Amino acid sequence: MFAVGIPLVSAALSVAFPGEGQSLPAVERTYVIGAASVSNSAPLVVNGATTDVWRTGAFLAMVPVKPGTNTLNVMCGKESLERRFVVAEPPKPGSWKPFKPITSAKDPRLGKPSAWRTRGTLFANRVRPVPDDGDTLHYLPPQFTVRGAEVEGTDWIAVWIGGKIGFLPPASLVKTPAVPVPSANKPAPDPAACFPSAPPRGVPPSAVRILVDPGHGGSDTGALSPHGWCEKDVNLSQARAIRDALRKAGFQVLMTRDDDSFPTLYSRPKLAYDEHMDVFISVHHNACRADRNPREVRHTTTYASNERGLALAAAIQKRIAAVLPDIKNSGAQTKSLAVCRNPAVPSCLLEVDFINLPEAEEASWDPERQKKVAEAVAQGVLDWMK
């Protein structure tokens, strides 16, 4: 049954995103999600274009937008609604070139390494292997010193940050030859290296303590689904199923929350440390940025922030992908997440599905699928321990 325990919206027609008066970044299009009554068989029209309606009444549309105030008109038979939202103006050229990172250079010839300072606040972007963006490898404040070298025949500077190489335009940096820099490329130390790297092998599940963390909670709703349901609620429902599956497998399990409370971000990994947990698993569901089509970017993945967590994430993600064959598997990925950076406890964060997609909303609240995902997580932990 669809959405057991969660009532359908009472309104005959609703829009969950974008919200009334909401401000969007400088985009050329946005997704619109909402729901119509399942008893209304009339065509659904969004800004003049007929839009498919999922069997639950949920719908997704992509509409073009322009800078300034935009008006959204949604009609379904005799029902209609109007929504206004604001799109930001695109950035205008500044006094120096904007940061345009690249990720590789074929056979670059580097000049003599020297020190460079950042001209202003700078984000060193990391390319993600999943269809979304917004992640950063490093945040560099003004006057931050990096080791760099000019790339001959190009207008780029190769820089070394924490053992990784990147390329920046010279307008982002100021050369400072007098500042001493390391002569070798020394990676930033991994705090997790101070702890045992192997999982608890040779012990029964009853000796392994696992902390399950339902993401968000309280006033922190997380993402929204077409019916306007909150990610925090489906995270809790899925986390409870994972807790039950882990206990059935014999593990000792605690949860960071079992209600609509909000444990602070850093209190969650701290609880894992204080309670001497062996594993930390944070449960989330995804959504994409406004100008992406959720149907095109839908995927499942598991994140970790260090090598200890990555092995755990890979084992769990392999099992989750097997029970979700219709969703793109983006594998286990590394990402600097506050809840996963605890070096003392192998930690990972699940992004099970994209709830801003009508069919994914239905699947994510389905108790039977939640049970399959939960059993996959439990089996993944067992695989990791072998």
Stretches found by the model and what they are:
Residues 1-10:
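Bacterial N-terminal signal peptides
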Residues 30-37:
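Aromatic/hydrophobic beta-strand junction motif of beta-rich domains
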Residues 39-43:
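Extracellular acidic loop/turn motifs
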